Design a protein with these regions (language model features):
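Transmembrane beta-barrel strands of outer-membrane/channel proteins
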Residues: 17-19, 45-49, 89-95, 124-130, ...
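Residues on the lipid-exposed face of transmembrane beta-strands in outer-membrane beta-barrel proteins
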Residues: 32-36, 72-78, 109-115, 128, ...
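Short glycine/proline- and aromatic-enriched beta-strand/turn motifs that initiate or cap beta-hairpins
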Residues: 9-55
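Outer-membrane beta-barrel transmembrane domain signature
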Residues: 129-176
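Hydrophobic/aromatic-rich structural module bridging two neighboring secondary-structure elements via a short loop
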Residues: 59-111
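Gram-negative outer-membrane beta-barrel proteins
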Residues: 21-23, 53-57, 80, 95-101, ...
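Short loop/turn motifs that connect adjacent beta-strands in outer-membrane beta-barrel proteins
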Residues: 8-12, 37-44, 77-88, 116-124, ...
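Residues that define the transmembrane beta-barrel architecture of outer-membrane proteins
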Residues: 11, 26-30, 64-70, 103-109, ...
Length: 176
């Protein structure tokens, strides 16, 4: 989730279709994601949908037995022309629905710090967030997230590397 110059308001949206090969998965997942920057920060969302309802078997070790999961976040930055320009306030919602088990809604609030090279081809955003998960006890209600993007790796136009890593704590019991 990066703050880029707001000279233009553009949205980047893409859809991806994956086949999960793991012995405990073997199904198709569709991911739709969108990133949009504006003069007050940026908005990001994604929706994952697993197409495996026809393979439902409650006795199987299948880790995601059909369902939809989404995250939507907003980074707010009203001080882009100040020494605090790399810092933003962050709010986020996570949730989903499946046939056999609940995905508890979660709200996250906190700050993020954005770094980039001069060309904006290489970016890194670090987030420290308070995370509250519905119907869940949490000893440490925090989430730390890193989001990165690298364009034209090794000088090869179009070769990109992007991703994220989330770290959080949650006490829970899953019953199927």
């Amino acid at each position: 989730l990066a703050l880029l110059p707001a000279s233009k308001t553009l949205a980047q949206t893409n859809a991806q279709v994956f086949y999960d090969f793991g012995s405990d998965r073997k199904f198709v997942t569709l991911t739709l994601e969108m990133f949009k920057q504006d003069k007050w920060g940026n908005t990001y969302f994604f929706v994952d949908h697993d197409f495996n309802y026809d393979k439902m078997d409650t006795s199987s070790p299948n880790v995601a037995q059909g369902g939809t999961y989404t995250e939507i976040s907003r980074a707010l930055n009203f001080w882009q022309n100040s020494p605090m320009k790399n810092w933003s306030l962050h709010v986020e919602y996570n949730g989903g629905i499946t046939k056999n088990y609940p995905i508890n809604n979660a709200w996250l609030f906190g700050v993020e710090y954005f770094m980039h090279d001069k060309s904006f081809k290489n970016t890194l955003t670090l987030q420290a967030l308070y995370k509250t998960i519905r119907k869940t006890d949490q000893n440490v209600p925090m989430q730390f997230t890193a989001v990165w993007g690298c364009k034209d790796i090794f000088g090869l136009k179009g070769l990109n590397f992007s991703g994220f890593a989330d770290f959080w704590w949650e006490n829970h019991v899953s019953m199927l």
